[in-house]
Structure formats: structure tokens, C-alpha cells
Amino acid sequence: VDKLHPLVLNIGLAIHNADWNWKNVSSPFTRLYYVTEGTAQILISGKIQILKANHMYFIPAFTKHSYICNSYFSHYYLHIYEEHQSDNNLLDNWDFPIEIPATELDLALFQRLCAINPHMTLQKSDPTSYDNNYTLMQNLLKNKQRTLSEKVESRGIVYQLLARFLQRAQIKMVLKDNRIEEAIHYIRKHINETIELGVLAEKSGLSKDHFIRLFKKETGDTPLRYIIRKKIEKAQ
């Protein structure tokens, strides 16, 4: 948990009337929703997820999805950006449930997060209006400019909400070899650069062939496939 540094990008209450319809959304931040009234749908991983009142929803960063809303729909939204994610994105190591039942405490936490961050609401629900590099940088700046007490309380609330999903999450892969774990950290940190297989093998103290075999044994992927997948995710 010492490596998890979630930052609040946006928090607020949104009310829609069949006007929450956006296709092929994919963002560098995680979305949490608490549905208060009405219903809507999300198309994610090829499946339709119905959004229901008194439930919370988790959409991981870099996950393509679409929104479908044909009637009244009210929900709290929370956008979380993981600081230092290029080095080691802790949330990326887990498979989270999309839906969990919500409690009165969850609702109170969302409401409190709204109360202490009134300037972090979305001006428009259209993802193209806020899911871009300029707005991301502006939101990160707003986050940094808050008082220390607001930062501490906000992060504490985000930890509590994430913990609710972590209770039902499954670890994606358990790395038994520290050399492969370090290689993955290096890949994430340098994902925007050209990553040479020879460099990874050398840092691990292994030959290329041995490194490839060990990497695949630990992750189920070859180093090249893993790097390509991460570059695609980053580019989306």
C-alpha cells in the first residue's frame, strides 16, 4: 500500500436523462461510480453491465468501454489517477469486480469527498471534454493546490472506497522471481521509450534465451508481447 498514491481528478454528482451515451471511452485514470437512482448500461469487455441503484462500479484505467443511457440516471463519479503509475501501477496488478453492493457508509464517503472538493466537478459529461492531456494536467495541478488537510482526507476516503473493491479482487499474477518483477517495473517506467530485450536480460543477469523463458513462465507472456500490450494500453 506504500506504493499506492491515488489522486482525485474529478468528483461529483451527475444527473442524466437519456443523455449519457458515449462510445469507445478509454482513459489513463480509474473510474468509480455510486448509482443513486435510475439505471444505465456500460458495454465493457464485450459484455453489457447494468448499472443499478445502491451499487458501486469500478472501471480500470486504459479499459475501453461505452455508456448507454435511455432514461433517468443519477450517480456519483470519482476519477482516480495513480501517481507514479509509469513505475509501478499497483491497481494494474489486480482484477477488480466491476460491480459490488454499496452501503450507507460508501454513500457518505462519496458525499464527503464532494464536500471537500467542490472545485473538482466535471463541467461536461462528454469524455472528450476532460479526457485529454491538457485537462489531465489542469486537474493534477488543482489536486496539488489543495490544502494538506484536504489532500490527506481525500486520500483516506479513496483508500476506503478502493478497499471495498479490493476485498473481492483477484491478483493478476504472483511473481515469484524478483528479477522478473524488476524487469516489469523497468518496462512500465520506460514504456514510452524503445525497450531492448538485451537490456532487460542484462539487468536481470540472464542470457536472452533464459530471460525469455523465465519471463514467460512467470507472466504467461513473452517480453515482446508484454511490452507491445503495455504500449497499446498506454496509447489508447
Please give the residue ranges for each predicted region.
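Generic protein-terminus/edge-of-domain signal
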Residues: V1-H55, A61-T63, C69-Y72, D87, ...
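A short, mixed-charge helix-start or loop-turn motif at secondary-structure junctions
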Residues: V1, N21, L140-T147, L197, ...
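Short, conserved loop/turn and helix-capping segments at secondary-structure boundaries
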Residues: F29, Y72, I100, E104, ...
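Short coil/turn motifs at secondary-structure junctions
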Residues: E83-Q85
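Terminal helix-turn-helix DNA-binding modules in bacterial transcription factors
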Residues: E181-S207, R213-Q236
